[in-house]
Amino acid sequence: MIDFEHVYKTYETHNDENVALEDINIHIDEGEFVFILGHSGAGKSTFLKLIQMEEKPTEGKVFINGQDLTRIKRRKVPYLRRQMGVVFQDFRLIPTMTVYENVAFAMRVTNISTKKIKDRVPFALSLVGLEDKMDRLPDELSGGEQQ
């Protein structure tokens, strides 16, 4: 579950302050599927950066599963991120690796065993309809398939 309570995020510029988020209050239940839409500069990326703990709010509190992210220790951040699923606008795929290798690489860097990777990659690809494309390179996929 995700909760924002009176969240503000401002960025300091040379002589000014840019307000990215202003008094955001939202509750997203576990398993709820959410789209974040808005014009350029509306704060969509900032919202996600706060959830992923890439940035901290200027004011307010962000909670993930009841944990106050403004109080979490930096060493615990990677463990919390592993529990999240985010579809990025830029796909962050390694162009010289196959679809299978890209997914396996993401699992390998989180210390998942080779045996579990061999089981989980085909399963994960089947969930998104890409089991028949696991040997293809990213540039052989459509934009939606890359996401």
Positions of PLM-derived features:
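A short, flexible loop at the N-terminus of ABC-type nucleotide-binding domains that lies
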Residues: 1, 10-23, 73
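Walker A (P-loop) phosphate-binding loop of ABC-type ATPase nucleotide-binding domains
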Residues: 38-42
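Helix-to-loop junction immediately C-terminal to a conserved catalytic motif
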Residues: 52
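Conserved ABC transporter NBD signature motif
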Residues: 60-68
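Conserved ABC ATPase "signature" region
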Residues: 67-68, 104, 108, 115-133
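ABC ATPase NBD coupling module
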Residues: 69-85, 114, 118
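Short coil-to-helix segment of the ABC ATPase nucleotide-binding domain corresponding to the Q-loop/switch region
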Residues: 97-105
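Conserved ABC ATPase signature
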Residues: 136-141, 145-146
